[in-house]
Amino acid sequence: MRTPARQRSRQTPIAKRQLILRVAREEFAARGFAATRVETLARKARVNKALLYYYFGSKLGLYKHIIHDDVDRFSARMREVAEAQATAEEKIARWVEALATHLTDEPTLPLMMLRELADGGSHLDAETLRELTIFVPLVRSLIEQGQREGVFGEADPITLHFMLMGSTLFFTANAPIRRRIRQLGYAQPPMEIAPFVNHLQHVALRSLRKDPDHAHSID
């Protein structure tokens, strides 16, 4: 059944806006903010520059919109893990899995995060920075729950957050390098994320447990 012309016209602005966002994510991830040109975005999205400026105001406005939207969805996903009904050990395992799943499902996000880190966060507005600050309190809540349950010892939430986030960011972002190393026959680095997730779960739990040699199932 053909969509009525009036309905198609209502959908067109939404579709164009979503296409601009998709193209912009790919370009910002591949080139960074400074090297991305509005002309390129408009050409690849098949819109004129005026429409892009109409929706987002400027290249910086578009970039901030994407970053804020991505961080907001990321933090919401991690908040779900922290607030779920589960033991602290289960939550730590799920936290690692959620990090890996989210950064794999949204491959432009780790690249944009690493580029922004290299730029000193110069393009992050106050609202986005505030949203980023929720990760450490969430990690702290997992540690404190484990301490109340008698299974975790003392641990620094900032260090744990950087260890888990940094490791996962690096693993997901360097997939093309691992693939090329395999193709050249220099080594056989893993391409699948499941073994990485499993190992990072065990490392995290072992570092947190009062008795690191006392194994618990994390399935």
Q: What are these language model-derived features?
A:
Residues 79-111, 157-164, 194-197, 219:
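Hydrophobic alpha-helical connector segments
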Residues 45-56:
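Short hydrophobic/aromatic patch on the recognition helix
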Residues 1-31, 35-46, 60-64, 72-73:
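Basic, helix-initiating cap at the start of DNA-binding domains
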Residues 66-94, 124, 142:
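Amphipathic alpha-helical linker/stalk segments
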Residues 104-126, 174-183:
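Amphipathic alpha-helical segments used for helix-helix packing
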Residues 1-4, 101, 105, 133-149, ...:
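C-terminal peripheral helix-coil segments that are non-catalytic and often amphipathic
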Residues 30-34, 85, 106, 149:
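Short coil/turn segments at alpha/beta junctions that flank glycine-rich nucleotide-binding fingerprints
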